[in-house]
């Protein structure tokens, strides 16, 4: 499906296949002109998370809803994006101390929830934590396991989201 500057975003969004497992990538040529129009077709949610490394260069991954993922969550009212990233990592993994590093980038993804399309922008940060901390999965967020993984040898790639592969490569 292709889009032009004359496209009606809401019509385009309405034509997305809800049953499909496809990953959609949307490139907007004249970003300033069309981005707000595109966003208006969605309920927009800001989120933040971290690619957390330890002293062995292993990455902290969570297992949630049958997928390997990175810790992240919604930005609370009155909270900055970088504060949310640290808080979410600490809450979801039970960590007591996390050092926030540089911002890695932003990933946008769309999903259908409660009869409305949602556009979530997730801001990702590089972080560090100690491998000696006790990891406690946040069960109420459906996290069933947390592991420090060697990204080169652990089979996480066979069961994750395309966006997580992107963040892991940054």
Regions found by a protein language model. Name each.
Residues 164-170:
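Charged phosphate-binding loop/patch that engages nucleotide di/tri-phosphates or the phosphate backbone
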Residues 75-163:
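Unchanged
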Residues 49, 58, 145:
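Conserved beta-strand and immediately adjacent loop positions that scaffold enzyme active sites
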Residues 1, 53-90:
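Conserved Nudix-box catalytic region and its N-terminal flanking loop in Nudix hydrolases
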Residues 43-48, 65, 120-122:
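Short connector loops at helix/strand junctions that flank enzyme active sites
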Residues 52-55, 127-129:
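Active-site beta-strand termini and strand-to-loop segments that position acidic
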Residues 3-49:
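Acidic, metal-coordinating catalytic segment for phosphate/diphosphate chemistry
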